[in-house]
Amino acid sequence: MTTIRIGVIGTGVMGTDHVETISKSIARAEVRAVADIDVGRAEAVAARIPGAKALSSAEALIESAEIDAVIIASSNPTHGPYTLASIAAGKPVLCEKPLAETAAECEQILRAEETAGTRLVQIGFMRRYDPGYVELRARVASGEIGAPLLAHCVHRNVSVPPLWTSEDIVLTSAVHEIDVMPWVFGREVVNVNWFSPVPNAPGVRRDPQVAILELEGGALIFIELFMAANYGYEIRCEIVGEKGTIELAPVSRTVARSDLRVQVDLAADWRPRFAEAYRRELQSWVNAILSWNSGDLNNVSGPVHGPDAWDGYRAAVIAEALVASMSSGGPVPVESLAIPGLYQQGRS
């Protein structure tokens, strides 16, 4: 197999972006089919991609003999069922976060992969492919700032979907920091705590929020989540160590100075900020599938070189602990399964 034939489930913002990125920028891969509950939208996306077609259902896409691998970018409640169907079909799958709506449902996916004896599932935690976070992790590991003690993270959006709840902010947005910061530090989360200021205008959600993650060894991660910050999309991260600090650099390409002001442009959402991360994620996923198909003995546990179903499960467990802290008003320990043997190989 020299080219991976990909089917994309969901043609909303994320699914359509994946279709376009694969078509324009990913080597040895092509989009052959899309599926969406809105058939007209799926047909419109397929019409822009030579050789692609809109299928009648996600199930038809997963089962198609013309599809080698599946991307799940549909609504959150569908992630678990479509991932399980892909495992049953023996097809590699890249599932956007969350892996499933609950940690218990994520556990079903772990069991399905254990039964299959193969890791087929990669979870879309694209920050692990962002050049800034990759360098942040490498420099922390190098020891140049000594032992890392704490991190300050900022995650701000322009606006929040009107039906989102306080819990949705944790389960859908905070999961990015929940995944990437233990990866940067190389330590697991053991306790969590959640806080929020009293809102000026109480409504359906608490925004902003602060999440505190305690890692093994006592390091702390402070995460500010502000989903209706209005001014722009912004991600910041600073690691404080015994001998110094490391932080993500600003990503604006230009800085304007005029009329006694300094100005930079901010994105309206996450896509410009993480465009390169998404491209690297997709190319790495395709390369891993090709390597696995070729019988690469260094990849015997499956076509996954990135965050896997175990990482999706851990993120869900930690997010649910934060939601429990939201309810209890105090710290909550993170309790999860012991890592199964299938997921121990190649972890770093």
Place the predicted regions along the sequence by residue.
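C-terminal helix-rich "cap/oligomerization" subdomain common to oxidoreductases
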Residues: 1, 69-71, 288-348
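N-terminal Rossmann-like dinucleotide-binding module
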Residues: 1-49
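Active-site loop of classical SDR/Rossmann-like NAD(P)-dependent oxidoreductases
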Residues: 17, 37, 230, 270-283, ...
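Beta-loop-alpha module in the N-terminal Rossmann-like domain of NAD(P)-dependent dehydrogenases
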Residues: 18, 49-112, 346
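Hydrophobic residues in well-ordered beta-strands that form the structural core
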Residues: 56, 95, 101, 121-123, ...
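A contiguous active-site-proximal alpha/beta segment in oxidoreductase catalytic domains
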Residues: 77, 100-160
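Mid-domain beta-loop-alpha active-site segment that forms a flexible
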Residues: 124-132, 157-193, 206-207, 311
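Contiguous beta-strand/loop segments that form the cofactor/metal-binding neighborhood of enzyme cores
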Residues: 172-254, 279-296, 339-348
